[in-house]
Curated annotation (Swiss-Prot):
Coiled coil: none annotated. This is Small ribosomal subunit protein uS15. One of the primary rRNA binding proteins, it binds directly to 16S rRNA where it helps nucleate assembly of the platform of the 30S subunit by binding and bridging several RNA helices of the 16S rRNA. Pfam families: Ribosomal_S15. Keywords: Ribonucleoprotein, Ribosomal protein, RNA-binding, rRNA-binding. One of its GO terms (biological process) is translation. The gene is rpsO.
Length: 89
């Protein structure tokens, strides 16, 4: 259910703007998207897990805020990111 260390390192490597970059909006959105996708799969089996659903909504909100920030700062990076992650917007 959680992201493995290898998967997290791969996402950071794929979306980092420079070596060692873990705080850029692209990396944060990629990690949140991975966690959101994992929780979405979890809810297919555990429909009544409302405690985790609240966490999912918080993650979606956080991702939305980061995407809005990135769109405001650099539209080209925003477009590239949503294309790479397959986020519909």
């Amino acid at each position: 259910m959680s992201i493995t260390a290898e998967r997290k390192a791969q996402l950071i490597k794929d979306f980092a703007t420079v070596e060692g970059d873990t705080g850029s909006p692209e990396v944060q959105v990629a990690l949140l998207t991975e966690r959101i996708n994992n929780l979405t799969e979890h809810f297919k089996d555990h429909k009544k897990d409302n405690h985790s659903r609240r966490g999912l909504l918080a993650m979606v909100s956080s991702r939305r805020s980061l995407l809005d920030y990135l769109k405001k700062k650099d539209e080209a990076r925003y477009s590239k990111l949503i294309g790479a992650l397959g986020i519909r917007r």
